[in-house]
Amino acid sequence: VFIKNSLKRSYNNGSIGSRFKDCIFYNSYYIRKVLEDSMARQYNHSAVEKKWNKYWKEHPVNVDDGKKEKYYCLDMFPYPSGSGLHVGHWRGYVISDVWSRYKMLKGHYVIHPMGWDAFGLPAENYAIKMGIHPAKSTAENVSNIKKQIDEIAAIYDWDMEVNTTDPNFYKWTQWIFVKMFKEGLAYEKEFPINWCPSCKTGLANEEVVDGVCERCKSPVTKKNLRQWMLKITAYADRLLNDLDKLDWPAKVKKMQADWIGKSYGAEVNFKVEGGEDSILVYTTRPDTLHGATFMVLSPEHTLAAKLATADKKEEVDKYILEASMKSNVNRMQAKEKTGVFTGSYAINPLNNKKVPIWLSDYVLADYGTGAIMCVPAHDERDFEFAKKFGLEIVQVISKDGKSGGELEEAYTEAQGIMINSGEWNGLESSTLKQKAAEYVEEKGFGKKTVNYKLRDWVFSRQRYWGEPIPIVHCPKCGNVAVPEEELPLLLPEVKSYQPTGTGESPLAAIDEWVNTTCPCCGEAAKRETNTMPQWAGSSWYFLRYIDNHNDKELVSKEKADKYLPVDMYIGGVEHAVLHLLYARFYTKFLHDIGVVGFDEPFKTLFNQGMITGKNGIKMSKSMGNVVSPDDLVRDYGCDALRMYELFVGPPELDSEWDDRGIEGVSRFLNRFWNMVMDAKDSKVEPSKEMLRLRHKLVSDIDHRLNDFSLNTVVAGFMEYNNKFIELSRKSGGIDVETLKTFVTLLAPFAPHISEELWQELGGEGSVFNTAWPSYDEETMKEEVMSIPVQVNGKTRAVLEVDVNIDKDELISMAKAELERIGKPVANIVKEIYVPGKIVNIVGK
């Protein structure tokens, strides 16, 4: 256009050449200048993120100066799996980093470490699948995932890094076991355990989900094995009672309480007819003893085979064998009850009636006494069993104290009146429940007692890739702990690390390692060949981060007192009765022996929801629905992905991933960038509206963030960005202080772009060295408000009025406005003003 107009104005053909040359020079300079200015304002996420990642490495923003209050924010550390990270893994890490950066801006020194849960079944199964030694595959996976975690730009302190396979770490895992052994909390026992035929190892009850192995999903069976156990039951009451101390989700606390399963009741002795034996049962309902019409024993009960009469022996033996092949979970969840009559009877001690003794696999050997008295009229399982096998049903509780004839289903109401119960008839069952336990004790055929569902922890595994259990088996001295000064007991190299399936660990084949001398007597002895479970290291790792190079003690008392416990713990709810329960147990034990001064590891717990693929299906390589973050970071930037991870849905709920959603977040970041870059040099003074909007922004974001409503925080940024863009158009810009405030609020969520814009706005150093903005309630109040004016309930006008206007003035303005628009009210009977809400004029 410039050239064309220049030539049109030139009538001197001789000057055309030089004029053309001049205008081309000027125009090219002008276009280049415009393009340079435009490029300078354009947001280039790759360049910005590269620049600030380098800056943070050279100038750490989270430094302990000894003056700041500590805040310990921790992720559940990952298994170093071979598949690496997908967008679902990012979510928890982004949440913890946002919270950590927020706490930094609030003036804390934030402890935010990362490490690797690298021993155990997940790592070993992957190594076997790939045909690589677990030591090599684990190291490779750690290296790969560490690179991926770096892409998140989280402020992890890698100087605190721990790895459960590092001998300098597992020295202390073994040390804890030795201490537990010396305190009588670690012991050896042979009994039927959950056995995974695929993983070829024993499993704790917590590792069996719906009858299958938590890891490989194979059906779980039973196997008699020598096992090491940890007496977690010794801490049952404290684990239950101390849940009240914790700022944890109610769901998790209930799951732990239910798993511990404390109940009050009575133990009652039933004598076997015609013999010296008696059967001890535990019942929570001693008030229903008159209704106990049969007994059921676990197939593993010590009297199970002995009670079989000659004509029932073959049938009983067969049933016991079949039950031994089922896992506890399968037995409990079986829809159809099975059983066999032993041919023997016991005597009900309350009414001296004979009751048949049955075996059934719905009764477990390790709960209560392994035997139950059955009251089919008032228990659904017993009712179903009695109906199937034609056993007597006697109702002893009814709603009104009257018998209603034959029951169609068990009466299981909590309250009722006793019937068919001798001297107890007419009593309220809830009152009798406590008195009945006392009566049983007074009469000498039982006692009041407390029972727990929680079982001792099966701690040993018949696998290679785990911490060696530091115990020596001596024929003379028995089980002897490896001396503490000889720890760590190193995991030896093996040629074959595959599980044997025989009940022996691969370590059993290394004679030169197994054969040793007893630390007590010096005679020939053998090492324990089972290894610890994957939960051993993860039950205490959070203590080691803060003192990970200490070779003299697990953690120094000085550092423990200064930096522990964990203030915020973030991870999935799937660990509610595994890792979280075990970590509480370990912490209480370490408190009891004086290692730490607190007995709960995690003050606050946040469980993030899962990111799923389409139709809510869990992301997995086998499903082909894994979304890698790498391409998204390349195309949209780390900041955009971080914010979309939060924007996709409420952080505590599962959310379905959709790549298209990140485009909206990317547009927001570009619009925000352009707003700041356009306004930064405008030298606009803050108007009342700018100040009001600034303080309202801070208030809204602060409240949403502290409510952990992170998705609405991101929505709030978008909402206020639009408001400021509109205000900027009206006012010719936005003042620098308001822009700095917005950038600071955004910084925990999108750290790279925030650092760059902070610098563009003239901020000193890093944005993370400033303080989280504050707000003033008075400043953020509106000066004007919109009041709808109604006539007989229908809106006719809207007035913009001062927030302090009085009723009479507002009513007058409303009438005048109605006159102006031709909607006057002739016969007014009532004038209503709801302050700050509405005016309604009622007329005939």
Regions from the language model: what does each represent?
Residues 65-132, 138, 161-176, 199, ...:
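N-terminal catalytic cores of NTP/NDP-binding nucleotidyl/phosphoryl-transfer enzymes
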Residues 117, 182-196, 448-477, 534, ...:
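Helix-rich, typically C-terminal accessory recognition domains appended to large enzymatic cores
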Residues 96, 109, 301-400, 405-406, ...:
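Catalytic alpha/beta core of large soluble enzyme barrels
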Residues 233, 238-261, 298-340, 487-512, ...:
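Amphipathic alpha-helical
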Residues 39-74, 104-113, 137-144, 319-358, ...:
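Conserved oxyanion/phosphate-binding beta-strand-loop segments in alpha/beta enzyme cores
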Residues 344-350, 354-367, 396, 514-651:
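Alpha-helical recognition segments enriched in aromatics with Gly/Pro capping
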Residues 9, 13, 24-59, 63-70, ...:
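Basic, alpha-helical terminal appendages of large translation-related enzymes
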Residues 42, 50-51, 55-59, 129-287, ...:
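Residue patterns forming the tRNA-binding/recognition surfaces of aminoacyl-tRNA synthetases
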